Amino acid sequence: MNGRLLEIVACPICQGRLKYDSENEQLICHFDHIAYPIKQGIPILLSDQAISLSTSLTNPEQQNQ
């Protein structure tokens, strides 16, 4: 994930900063406790595609859908 992109991209729900999780290929909003998947190098910043952090930790297979 490009560091410059991380400087300008924001959570679509709270407009907060996102943190890159390279292990799971997702952008995390710690304020809302959600993650946005990155598919083929493209962050999917749609609120209906966001994954609850508790869900992603307990069911990692959901991230690949």
UniProtKB/Swiss-Prot annotation:
Pfam families in UniProt: Trm112p (PF03966)
InterPro entries: Trm112-like
SUPFAM superfamilies: Trm112p-like (SSF158997)
Disulfide bonds: none
GO-annotated cellular components: cytosol
Listed HAMAP family: UPF0434
Protein family per UniProt: Belongs to the UPF0434 family.
Protein name stated in the entry: UPF0434 protein HS_0657
Organism, scientific name: Histophilus somni (strain 129Pt) (Haemophilus somnus)
